[in-house]
A protein has these predicted regions:
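Short helix/loop capping segments that flank catalytic or ligand/cofactor-binding pockets
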Residues: 10, 23, 74-77
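Short, conserved non-catalytic motifs in the polymerase core
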Residues: 1-11, 26-39, 101-123
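Short glycine-rich, polar/acidic loop-and-turn segments at beta strand-coil junctions
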Residues: 5-6, 16, 69
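Active/ligand-binding-proximal structured segments within catalytic/core domains
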Residues: 10, 14-18
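Short acidic (Asp/Glu) patches
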Residues: 37-52
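Conserved polymerase palm-domain catalytic core
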Residues: 48-146, 150-165
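A generic secondary-structure signal for well-formed alpha-helical elements
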Residues: 17-26, 85-93
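Short secondary-structure capping/junction motifs at helix and strand boundaries
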Residues: 21-30, 56-60
Length: 165
Protein backbone atom coordinates (compact mmCIF):
# COMPACT_ATOMS: atom_id res chain seq x y z
CA UNK A 1 0.00 0.00 0.00
CA UNK A 2 1.43 3.37 -1.02
CA UNK A 3 2.08 6.02 1.60
CA UNK A 4 -0.31 8.98 1.52
CA UNK A 5 1.05 12.32 0.31
CA UNK A 6 0.81 14.06 3.70
CA UNK A 7 2.59 11.11 5.36
CA UNK A 8 5.30 11.21 2.70
CA UNK A 9 5.78 14.94 3.31
CA UNK A 10 6.09 14.36 7.05
CA UNK A 11 8.56 11.51 6.54
CA UNK A 12 10.63 13.61 4.14
CA UNK A 13 10.80 16.46 6.64
CA UNK A 14 11.65 14.06 9.48
CA UNK A 15 14.47 12.54 7.43
CA UNK A 16 15.90 15.78 6.07
CA UNK A 17 15.73 17.79 9.29
CA UNK A 18 16.29 15.25 12.08
CA UNK A 19 17.18 11.70 11.09
CA UNK A 20 19.75 12.33 8.37
CA UNK A 21 21.81 14.97 10.25
CA UNK A 22 21.91 12.98 13.49
CA UNK A 23 22.21 9.43 12.20
CA UNK A 24 24.81 9.90 9.47
CA UNK A 25 27.31 11.57 11.81
CA UNK A 26 28.67 8.20 12.89
CA UNK A 27 28.86 6.67 9.40
CA UNK A 28 32.21 5.61 7.99
CA UNK A 29 33.40 7.31 4.79
CA UNK A 30 32.95 4.13 2.76
CA UNK A 31 29.25 3.69 3.51
CA UNK A 32 28.18 5.01 0.11
CA UNK A 33 24.39 4.57 -0.12
CA UNK A 34 21.57 7.11 0.22
CA UNK A 35 23.61 10.06 1.44
CA UNK A 36 24.23 13.53 0.04
CA UNK A 37 27.25 13.50 -2.26
CA UNK A 38 27.40 9.72 -2.34
CA UNK A 39 25.81 6.98 -4.41
CA UNK A 40 26.73 4.35 -6.97
CA UNK A 41 29.40 6.50 -8.65
CA UNK A 42 30.98 7.28 -5.29
CA UNK A 43 30.98 3.58 -4.37
CA UNK A 44 32.70 2.72 -7.65
CA UNK A 45 35.26 5.49 -7.15
CA UNK A 46 35.96 4.34 -3.58
CA UNK A 47 36.31 0.77 -4.82
CA UNK A 48 38.91 1.92 -7.35
CA UNK A 49 40.76 3.88 -4.65
CA UNK A 50 40.86 0.86 -2.33
CA UNK A 51 41.92 -1.53 -5.11
CA UNK A 52 44.72 0.80 -6.22
CA UNK A 53 46.00 1.28 -2.67
CA UNK A 54 45.86 -2.43 -1.98
CA UNK A 55 47.58 -3.31 -5.27
CA UNK A 56 50.37 -0.78 -4.73
CA UNK A 57 51.12 -2.25 -1.31
CA UNK A 58 50.44 -5.97 -1.89
CA UNK A 59 50.41 -6.60 -5.62
CA UNK A 60 47.82 -9.04 -6.88
CA UNK A 61 48.08 -11.34 -3.85
CA UNK A 62 44.84 -11.18 -1.95
CA UNK A 63 41.14 -11.81 -1.81
CA UNK A 64 38.14 -9.64 -2.75
CA UNK A 65 34.82 -11.18 -1.70
CA UNK A 66 31.73 -9.30 -2.87
CA UNK A 67 28.96 -9.93 -0.36
CA UNK A 68 25.23 -9.36 -0.16
CA UNK A 69 23.09 -9.59 2.96
CA UNK A 70 20.27 -11.75 1.65
CA UNK A 71 16.73 -10.45 2.15
CA UNK A 72 18.11 -7.57 4.22
CA UNK A 73 15.06 -5.30 4.17
CA UNK A 74 12.59 -8.18 4.39
CA UNK A 75 14.29 -9.83 7.38
CA UNK A 76 15.31 -6.90 9.58
CA UNK A 77 13.63 -7.27 12.99
CA UNK A 78 11.76 -4.12 14.01
CA UNK A 79 13.40 -4.21 17.46
CA UNK A 80 16.86 -4.08 15.86
CA UNK A 81 15.87 -1.25 13.51
CA UNK A 82 14.31 0.82 16.30
CA UNK A 83 17.33 0.28 18.57
CA UNK A 84 19.70 1.40 15.80
CA UNK A 85 17.71 4.61 15.35
CA UNK A 86 17.28 5.35 19.07
CA UNK A 87 21.02 4.83 19.68
CA UNK A 88 21.80 7.67 17.27
CA UNK A 89 18.98 10.15 17.98
CA UNK A 90 18.84 12.79 20.68
CA UNK A 91 15.28 13.83 19.79
CA UNK A 92 12.95 11.35 21.53
CA UNK A 93 9.86 12.63 19.70
CA UNK A 94 11.56 11.90 16.38
CA UNK A 95 12.53 8.45 17.69
CA UNK A 96 8.92 7.74 18.66
CA UNK A 97 7.66 8.83 15.22
CA UNK A 98 10.30 6.67 13.57
CA UNK A 99 9.23 3.70 15.71
CA UNK A 100 5.66 4.20 14.48
CA UNK A 101 6.80 4.30 10.86
CA UNK A 102 8.82 1.10 11.31
CA UNK A 103 5.87 -0.60 13.03
CA UNK A 104 3.57 0.48 10.17
CA UNK A 105 5.24 -2.14 7.97
CA UNK A 106 3.35 -4.77 9.95
CA UNK A 107 4.55 -7.80 11.84
CA UNK A 108 7.75 -7.84 13.85
CA UNK A 109 10.15 -8.31 10.94
CA UNK A 110 10.67 -6.51 7.65
CA UNK A 111 11.19 -2.92 6.60
CA UNK A 112 9.45 -1.74 3.42
CA UNK A 113 11.55 -0.73 0.43
CA UNK A 114 11.48 2.74 -1.07
CA UNK A 115 10.70 4.90 1.93
CA UNK A 116 13.35 7.45 2.85
CA UNK A 117 12.89 6.43 6.50
CA UNK A 118 13.50 2.79 5.51
CA UNK A 119 16.74 3.67 3.77
CA UNK A 120 18.23 5.71 6.60
CA UNK A 121 17.06 3.10 9.13
CA UNK A 122 18.73 0.25 7.26
CA UNK A 123 21.94 2.25 6.92
CA UNK A 124 21.92 2.80 10.68
CA UNK A 125 21.35 -0.91 11.36
CA UNK A 126 24.63 -1.81 9.62
CA UNK A 127 26.65 1.13 10.98
CA UNK A 128 27.94 -0.96 13.90
CA UNK A 129 29.05 -3.64 11.43
CA UNK A 130 30.97 -1.02 9.44
CA UNK A 131 32.82 0.14 12.53
CA UNK A 132 33.48 -3.43 13.68
CA UNK A 133 35.02 -4.38 10.34
CA UNK A 134 37.12 -1.23 10.06
CA UNK A 135 38.12 -0.72 13.69
CA UNK A 136 38.04 -4.09 15.47
CA UNK A 137 38.96 -6.42 12.60
CA UNK A 138 41.19 -3.72 11.10
CA UNK A 139 40.11 -4.49 7.55
CA UNK A 140 41.18 -1.23 5.97
CA UNK A 141 39.77 -1.87 2.51
CA UNK A 142 36.00 -2.17 2.95
CA UNK A 143 33.21 -0.49 0.98
CA UNK A 144 29.47 -0.80 1.55
CA UNK A 145 26.48 0.21 -0.55
CA UNK A 146 23.29 -0.55 1.42
CA UNK A 147 23.32 -4.34 1.91
CA UNK A 148 26.18 -5.07 -0.51
CA UNK A 149 29.81 -4.82 0.54
CA UNK A 150 33.33 -5.65 -0.57
CA UNK A 151 36.29 -6.58 1.60
CA UNK A 152 39.87 -6.54 0.30
CA UNK A 153 42.53 -8.36 2.30
CA UNK A 154 45.60 -10.54 1.83
CA UNK A 155 44.58 -13.16 4.42
CA UNK A 156 41.76 -15.50 3.40
CA UNK A 157 41.32 -16.69 7.01
CA UNK A 158 40.74 -13.13 8.24
CA UNK A 159 38.06 -12.65 5.58
CA UNK A 160 36.40 -15.97 6.36
CA UNK A 161 36.27 -15.00 10.05
CA UNK A 162 34.75 -11.63 9.14
CA UNK A 163 32.13 -13.23 6.90
CA UNK A 164 31.04 -15.66 9.62
CA UNK A 165 30.05 -12.75 11.84
Amino acid sequence: VATRIKDRQFQRSLCDNVLYPQITRSFIRDNCACQCGKGVDDALNRMNVHLRRYFLKNGSNGWVPKCDIRHYFAETPHTVAKAAIRKRLTDQDAAAYTDMIIDSFGGEVGIGLGSQVSQITELAVLDDLDHFIKERLRIKHYIRYMDDFVLIHNDKDVLQTALKL
